[in-house]
Every structure is written in C-alpha cells, then in structure tokens.
Amino acid sequence: KGEDDVIIICEDEHVFTENYQRDKFLDQVMRCAQFGTQILFGGIGGFGKAVPIESELFWIDWNWCTQFMVIYQSAFDKILNTRFTKKDVVDEYLGKIIPNKVVIHPFISIQKEFGYSDITKGNERVGQIGKYFDDADLRLKTYEHIVKKYDIML
C-alpha cells in the first residue's frame, strides 16, 4: 500500500509489437485513468464483448491470455482482498473480478512462444497462443471497421 497510481505487470513471454510507442502508451495510460479504468491491457488472446470507447481503446467485459497489463490504484484493494487458489489463472480471474477493463488495439504487446513451463493444458501446440491473439485482433479490427463505416463518433 504505497503511493503508486499504477503498477505495470509484464510476464516473461511478453514482447512489444511494432505498434508500441512510449509517449502514445503513456497518453493512453493517463486517458484511461480519466475513464476510471481499473486494468489496461496491452494485448489479449480472447474476450467476450468489446465496445470502442476512443480511438485504439476498447472496453471489454472479460478476457484471458494476456502478458502485459497496467493495474490502476482503484483495483489494488479488490485484488489484494481476493483469495486466489492454485487453480486460478490470474489474468483470466482478474478479467472476471475487475469490471472496468480496457484493451489497447492495435495490440502493443503479444505473447512470444518459447516453451512455457506453466502453460494451460490444450495450449501447448506450437502456434496456438499466436492464433488466439490473431483471432482477437481480427475481431477488434471488425469493430473498428464498423465504427469507421458508419462514422460513429467516439
């Protein structure tokens, strides 16, 4: 319980994409704080529903498969008071208990594949994790296309 406004969690399989730009990312972190965001994800492998809230930012209802996240102070107590079990997949669990989640798209972070020791059963096939990110990317591109096609103001 310090004075941190945010904590960035970056797992060992994280790699920045060509979309990462330091100053732009910092602006997005600040902008999301104004929205009351509790977790900002740099990339995700799956999600339920998504709503564009601003250029390159989507609110999501739940998510899984992430390796880079910014956790805002407003989520600290909720996380610290949650009882995790050994079976919980932390990023997926956080996606369920924290309501105000946003993902940056195009993704600024993806998972590199290197032979995980902690991989979830079923995801051990080479290329599987990358496919999840590609599928999530395609879904978000579809939302972006609709916003542009119908000139929806964000």
Spans of features found by a protein language model:
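An acidic/histidine-cluster motif and surrounding catalytic segment
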Residues: 1-10, 14-154
